[in-house]
Amino acid sequence: KNPWSVPYWQNLEEAYTRAMRNKGHEFSVGRVTYMYDGQHLWYALPSGRILCYPFAKLEADGVTYAKAAWKPAADATEWPRARLWKGLACENITQATANDLLRHALRQLDDVVLHVHDEIVLETDRPEEMAEQLERVMCTPPEWAKGLPLGAEVAIMSRYGK
């Protein structure tokens, strides 16, 4: 249980709601910034990557957006809508930031054969050396994530497994 999580969620909700009410203005929470352009709700991650809740609307019960990842019915005239709530906003930021960290690590490594969620798999004839490098790379945050505590559990295996 993290005592900062509930206030952070509330601050996120306040920021994206204020952005929806103030077209063209930016509202930040920590290192995340929201901006509504009149059609889409955009948010900038600490890495600088920009993500979007498409066709966002401020409704009586909160913010909704077009859930483009869902396949609509064949006769549907528009994408289904989903409700943006503070926990989902936090989850989206967390998952996207984790992805940015993974991609940062991948760009620094040779011998990568695959990655699964938060795991990186290397194939090498220098396992001990590469295990040390992998841990060092995965535990060193990029400039935009300075101060973020990172950890990695590295294992040497003859084939991929859990």
What are these regions (language model features)?
Residues 1-162:
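Conserved catalytic core of nucleotide polymerization and phosphodiester-bond processing enzymes
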